[in-house]
A protein has these predicted regions:
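Metal-dependent phosphoester-hydrolase catalytic domains
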Residues: 6-120
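Active-site flanking residues adjacent to catalytic metal/cofactor-binding acidic residues
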Residues: 2-4
Length: 120
């Protein structure tokens, strides 16, 4: 399951999936949400709203991707590069949006990308 969920990993809408915060808690048929730990424990998010980081852009994994055989989850990260951020002004430190109202800002998105690394 992946997308802009419009909620953080620990919000009620996401908790209905039953996804676990830690890999060791995942049983057969469960989901694992690595972004929960990324936001809550590491303080890293994908969008900044009123000075607070949120992590709406999530990739939730099935237990099959945590097995020892075949393609499996290795790690995740929020893709953070200097050019993705507003460099000055009121919104300094926020992701550099494409536009703000009618003003073209020549940015990328108001959200940072998320990446899941898989290995054989």
């Amino acid at each position: 399951v992946m997308g802009d969920m419009n909620d953080d990993p620990m919000d009620n809408s996401m908790l209905t999936l039953g996804a676990k915060k830690y890999r060791k808690e995942v049983g057969k048929g469960d989901f694992f949400n690595p972004w929960w730990e990324t936001l809550e424990d590491k303080g890293v998010g994908t969008l900044l709203y009123r000075g607070k980081w949120n992590l709406f852009d999530q990739i939730v994994l099935s237990s099959a991707l945590l097995k020892k055989k075949g393609l499996k989850y290795d790690h995740n990260e929020v893709f953070i590069r200097e050019y993705l951020f507003q460099q000055d002004g009121k919104y300094k430190g926020s992701p550099l949006r494409t536009h703000g109202g009618k003003l073209w800002l020549n940015g990328y998105s108001d959200h940072l990308p998320t990446i899941i690394y898989l290995k054989k």
